[in-house]
Swiss-Prot record:
This is Elongation factor P. One of its GO terms (cellular component) is cytoplasm. Keywords: Cytoplasm, Elongation factor, Protein biosynthesis. Gene3D superfamilies: 2.30.30.30, Nucleic acid-binding proteins. Pathway: Protein biosynthesis; polypeptide chain elongation. One of its GO terms (molecular function) is translation elongation factor activity. It is found in: Cytoplasm. Belongs to the elongation factor P family. The gene is efp. GO terms for biological process: peptide biosynthetic process. Pfam families: EFP, EFP_N, Elong-fact-P_C.
């Protein structure tokens, strides 16, 4: 199905030249003279590169043949990540470039969304909020009560996030995986 210029928005998936892209950023421009156009930054699902593309009135792009499947992350071995389809129990292996930034939020057994393009896995999406245990952070000191102050904390997946001073090593916290921000302690 063709997608018109007026339908473009952030997060929309499109296909150009047989390559699937996600719109990362877009701006609708109405110049004083001439027709309006959309300037967009689009990210390739295949290689992760971001390019800038201009769409003019009347331009159309195709909706990619993408399927999202819920899969279970099993384990990481070298530069490959193993996943299992929770419906068919079929296992697939993805490399570092296909998993990308999602790897720093994935725990063994976690359910993730794997994106397939023409039946080939191309990317992994983790939940927007994950609960992870802090394995290393600086201890608290008397007087560290300013709510605006933060300290780095290493999570069980190896990711490092900034947390308030009252958060201690060994505690489990919720983190927004898109902004990489601390949300709250898990009770």
């Amino acid at each position: 199905m063709a997608i018109g210029m007026s339908e473009l928005k952030k997060g929309l998936k499109i296909e150009l030249g047989g390559v699937p892209y996600r719109i990362v950023e877009y701006q609708h421009v109405k110049p004083g003279k001439g027709a309006a156009f959309v300037r967009a930054k689009i990210k390739s699902f295949l290689d992760g590169k971001v390019i800038e593309k201009t769409f003019h009135a009347g331009d159309k792009c195709e909706e990619p043949n993408l399927v999202e499947k819920t899969m279970q992350y099993l384990y990481h071995d070298g530069d490959t990540y193993q996943f299992m389809d929770i419906e068919s129990y079929e296992q697939i292996a993805l490399n570092d470039s296909q998993v990308g930034e999602a790897s720093k939020w994935m725990l063994d057994g976690m359910q993730v969304q794997v994106l397939l393009h023409n039946d080939k896995a191309i990317s992994v999406d983790v939940p927007q909020v994950v609960a992870l245990k802090i394995v290393e952070t600086a201890p608290n000191f008397k007087g560290d009560t300013s709510s605006a102050s933060k300290k780095p904390a290493t999570l069980e997946t190896g990711a490092v996030v900034q947390v308030p001073f009252h958060v201690l090593e060994g505690e489990t916290i919720k983190v927004n995986t898109e902004t990489e921000e601390y949300l709250e302690k898990v009770k």
